[in-house]
Amino acid sequence: WAFNVITTGGAAKAYSPSGHNRFTIRQLLAPFDQTAYLCNMQYLPPFAIMGTHRLNTADIELHAVQYEQLLVALHNDRISEAEWKSVTYLNDLIPLPQSVMD
């Protein structure tokens, strides 16, 4: 597998054909998708945290827990190909915890 972990300053709506940035996140990451393809790797959707300049420390910590849970789930084969192919962002597969203790 291969996937990108990114942060953006803009909101999710900015990354669409009609948005400020004119392209989706997946379109902007197309060169990485092609590299994974050439290396015979499966390219998963990105883990993307949007609007990071508006996040406080607690929000950032929650996203860190979410990312850790994603890595554990991938490592333990708890996310199927059908599941990751059905989402725009890997974040969509792991609920954002309510606290860092979740």
Residue ranges and their predicted role:
Residues 1-33, 39:
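Helix-loop-strand module that forms the ligand-binding subsite of alpha/beta enzymes
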